[in-house]
Regions:
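N-terminal ligand-binding lobe of clamshell/alpha-beta domains
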Residues: 10, 14-250
């Protein structure tokens, strides 16, 4: 290929990329997943509406992840609604599709499935996306309990993004042996499983300082940003580094 032909080829590629980014920026997207809202915003494709849990007070809110305002979403006439199997309810997905909306259902339970679904999301909006690889970190070789609710105490099971993210850092989630992805258990059971540490995320339920004392005779407890543990997407590469740095000293 001559220099002029090569230059024309590069120019066409730049024009195609520019058009794809232009198309993405003007798509009307409703996001019912906080991590998707964060990722789309980082891509320069801010949703026209999102949930009240998306930490975007500047955007129009259409309810929560478990109770979205379906009629309000339909009235917005979006080009695309994004949901996640792990985050949203199937009945809301069915209601949105029955209303004739284009709904993209993601199902992220690991770093691998995250990358697959980020490509699907990018493809759905015409965005040229290169997956940001998560840098491998040294294994921490710890066993951890991760409380996400109190009364009753609940944790995360094996087939969840948070558990798989910890696994990537060499941390074994002691609740992986339960059949449920959100098992209920009492602290005597936790103590019997002998975790090395207790990782206390800031969400979905923020455990008060007074309640941390209940872990005192089990293992050291450390608070972490729940978004780093449970929100997948553009934040994940840096989230792994932050969590690893915080947990490796314990």
């Amino acid at each position: 290929m001559g220099d002029h032909a090569r230059a024309r080829s590069f120019k066409r590629a730049r024009i195609a990329l520019g058009w794809a980014q232009h198309r993405a920026a003007f798509m009307n997207v409703v996001s019912l997943v906080p991590s998707v809202t964060e990722t789309l915003s980082a891509w320069g494709v801010a949703p026209i509406a999102c949930t009240k849990y998306c930490e975007r007070p500047d955007l129009h809110h259409v309810g929560g992840t478990k109770n979205p305002e379906v009629e309000a979403i339909v009235a917005l006439e979006p080009d695309l609604v994004v949901v996640d199997v792990q985050e949203n309810r199937v009945e809301d997905f069915n209601a949105l599709t029955k209303a004739g909306l284009n709904v993209l259902a993601l199902d992220v339970v690991s770093i691998e499935t995250m990358n697959v679904d980020l490509r699907r999301l990018a493809g759905a909006i015409g965005y040229e996306h290169a997956v940001s690889e998560v840098t491998e970190v040294s294994p921490l070789n710890r066993r951890a309990f991760v409380p996400i609710w109190r009364r009753p105490w609940m944790s995360i099971g094996a087939d969840t993004f948070g558990s798989r993210l910890l696994e990537a850092m060499g941390i074994t989630n002691i609740c992986c042996e339960f059949e449920s992805n959100y098992p209920e258990l009492d602290l005597s059971t936790v103590a019997g499983m002998q975790p090395d540490l207790i990782i206390v995320p800031s969400e979905p339920y923020e455990i008060e300082d007074a309640h941390l004392e209940e872990f005192a005779n089990i293992a050291p407890a450390v608070r972490v940003d729940g978004r780093d543990l449970f929100w997948w997407g553009v934040r994940t590469p840096e989230a792994v580094k932050r969590l690893h740095e915080q947990l490796r000293s314990l």
